[in-house]
UniProtKB/Swiss-Prot annotation:
Entry's Gene Ontology cellular component terms: mitochondrion
Keywords: Meiosis, Mitochondrion
This protein's name: Meiotically up-regulated gene 153 protein
BP-aspect Gene Ontology terms: meiotic cell cycle
UniProt subcellular location: Mitochondrion
Known function: Has a role in meiosis.
Organism of this sequence: Schizosaccharomyces pombe (strain 972 / ATCC 24843)
Amino acid sequence: MGSPSLTKTINASLSLHSITQPITLLKTMHYVLQLTILPSAMQHYATLRNFTHPACSVNKQAEQGKEQQQYAMKSQFQFRSGICSKVRSDELGFKGNSLQLNDLPKNPY
């Protein structure tokens, strides 16, 4: 059939090929996964994450408007209470722009 050295070489290469074939298959699968499946999955996830239903966006705008209104009311209250505390502290003879807890007169009762 052939020389014994050629047969040995063929057998050795076949056994080596049978060992390396699963590794090659795994590498190929890995590349396929990297090149095709992962990018499309990531893109799909990005579109899902960025998608907002029109009703949701309206609700979001309403929430933002509400937050701005609350912030305006809060800052207005802080401004007014700052003025009131300054006037009150000036009436009581304390210096500074706000009353401290121990600056208040003690309850005689």
